[in-house]
Amino acid sequence: MYEFFSPTKIIFGEGCASETVPRIREMGATKVLIVTGKSSTASSQGFKDLCKGLDAAGIQWVHFAEVGADPETSTVDKGAEVYRANDCNAIIGFGGGSPIDCAKGIAASIGEGRPIRDFVGTGLAFTKPVPPLVAIPTTAGTGTEVTNAAVFTIVDERGHRSKKGTSSQFYFPRLAIVDPLLHMSMPPSLTAATGMDALTHAIEAFVSRFHTPVSDMYCLEAVRRIGRSLRAACGISAVSDASADTSMNGASGAGRGVKAGSSGSGGRALLEARSDMALAATLAGVGLSQAGLGMVHGFAHPVGAMAGLAHGLANAILLPFVMEALIPDAGERLSTIGEALTGEQGISPQEAVRAIARLGRDIGIPENLEAAEVPQRYFEDILADALSYRRRKASPRAFTDDELKSLLERMYSGKVEI
């Protein structure tokens, strides 16, 4: 027996962002809190069009633009205060995974009338309805626009940072607006990292112990689209093109060590690749909500929290190592993944892992954590966090603590051959 629950209405297609205002008006919204990141989102044409549309419809709005990468629980609480102080009655999350996760947390906090920290890492469940929430992703990676999950950073009294995932049916946005045109300005390095994030979601959910025929369908279609379009979305027409360094070095570690081609304008071909990636991320999000995730995320969360490596990039680096370790336990399903990713038949589990690693190398993903400049001093803390990862039970292999330590050692300085 299995269940399938995915209540988010999805509107997908070029230009569909124009549907946002009429749809949120149908929800009875009169004053909207728009949650975005601190970066260039607010200066984007898509954001300006959204605000103009709300103004024209007579819907008031308040902009909360204090969301950093992997939002801290204190940021969520601050957003909830802004919502209450301005008597808002709906929320729009506009941007990448962090602003949308923050919007989810704000909605849940408003519904419960309590700080989000009361629910993160405590086991306490949400029980009360939330305000109308619309998610508008501008990156193709997390799929959070359709998931029941959100990830927040907790900073304790010692300054120790840890990322904790939470899940609830109340996190599902009421509406997801997935417009590939909003993704066209993503630089190649961000496209690469977020694209591999989506691939990680699809693969981990597909090999999960809790996979179902329905989740499999979503995950495999996501893998197919990523396999045929991620290189092109990064501006790479051939493997040899992946030579120009377009790294974006910043505090978030979003592009640390990432190389990819120039995105250029690309015309129709680039838009089609972006559309494939946008849909793939959404499909993978549906899949992971049904089947869960595994030890790639078990390691990626502490790597991101402690070393400042962007979540998508951390997943991209760690994915082939974990899948290599799963060959004895999930070989048949990895072969199926390999066939979907490459479009070829008769792929062995080993060839599938090499195909995953090759895709990462082609778009400039570093081959290990050392190459991504993750300091060795974080090793023990990363391991301790991974050992306590609550989703270990979804892994098709019941890793021992010693196996996870050996795996992390390999992630630091090893290499998955391609």
Language-model regions, residue ranges each:
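Carboxylate- and glycine-rich phosphate/diphosphate-binding segment that chelates Mg2+/Mn2+
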Residues: 149-291, 402
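Short alpha-helical scaffolding segments that buttress acidic/His motifs in well-ordered protein cores
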Residues: 199-203, 277-285, 299, 319, ...
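Short glycine/serine/threonine-rich phosphate/pyrophosphate-binding segments
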Residues: 17-20, 43-46, 73-75, 98-103, ...
